[in-house]
């Protein structure tokens, strides 16, 4: 998995936010507000080769079952793909 768009992660007023930077500003309109889980997935995304790598990191970090972690990862990555942020 590779991040295709330049995105800047920020925490503002307790919210986890992705802000388009560079040329991504031209392609994407607005900010992406993420849950704590989404922010965690974003933080490990650049180190992960597969969705399963991210799921395993979630299982290490959170008290969650594998099925829930898989669903959360699949949903979040699906949204990033929808907006062309990742491959």
Listing of model-derived features with the role each one plays in the protein:
Residues 1-39, 43-46:
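Acidic, low-complexity/disordered tracts enriched in E/D and polar residues
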Residues 30-87:
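Long, charge-rich, low-complexity alpha-helical segments
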């Amino acid at each position: 998995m590779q991040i295709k768009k330049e995105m800047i992660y920020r925490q503002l007023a307790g919210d986890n936010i992705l802000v388009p930077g560079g040329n991504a500003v031209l392609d994407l309109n607005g900010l992406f507000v993420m849950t704590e889980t989404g922010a965690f997935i974003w933080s490990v995304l650049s180190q992960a080769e597969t969705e399963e790598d991210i799921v395993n990191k979630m299982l290490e970090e959170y008290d969650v079952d594998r099925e829930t972690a898989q669903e959360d990862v699949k949903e979040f990555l699906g949204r990033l793909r929808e907006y062309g942020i990742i491959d």
